[in-house]
Regions:
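N-terminal cap/leader regions of alpha/beta-hydrolase-fold enzymes
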Residues: 1-147
Length: 147
């Protein structure tokens, strides 16, 4: 089965609407994801109305989903210094594209490989990087969302 980004964006749009309308939900809905989920977090920020903030971890969407001219939500990106799947040059290009459109995109690069947050993967996991990325994520969401 192949991942369908367009369908995932439809589902994400419905999820955001549900969360905002739910009695225990809130108006400040944010999104995060890892790897493909990180790519989806950026794609959703660019294409799903109503998201308040985004925190992608080591993932980038296809260029056709990058519509930063519509974005008002800030982003905090976490990427590995050495990542064969998501090279730093591509990350920098996306960050520059976002910033050129006036989007706040804070970006950090960490030791470890693709999946540096994933403890069960000793080849990529990097404990200090994982903790720092998590601490930055919590601080970011406290500043930009109802956490």
């Amino acid at each position: 089965m192949q991942f369908q980004t367009d369908h995932a964006l439809v589902v994400t749009t419905a999820a955001v609407a549900f969360l905002k309308s739910h009695p225990r939900g809130g108006q400040e809905v944010s999104i995060t994801g890892f790897c493909l989920g990180g790519a989806m977090a950026i794609a959703a920020i660019c294409n799903v109305p109503g998201l308040h903030a985004g925190v992608p971890f080591y993932g980038l969407p296809l260029p056709k989903y990058l519509h930063f001219d519509k974005v008002r939500a800030p982003l905090l990106g976490h990427f590995a210094e050495t990542d064969a799947h998501v090279p730093a040059e591509k990350v920098q290009a996306v960050v520059e594209q976002a910033r050129a459109a006036g989007v706040s995109f804070e970006c950090h690069f960490y030791q470890g490989g693709h999946g540096f947050m994933r403890k069960p993967d000793p080849q990529s996991y990097h404990a200090e990087s994982a903790q720092l990325a998590w601490d930055r994520t919590i601080a970011f969401l406290k500043r930009h969302a109802a956490v």
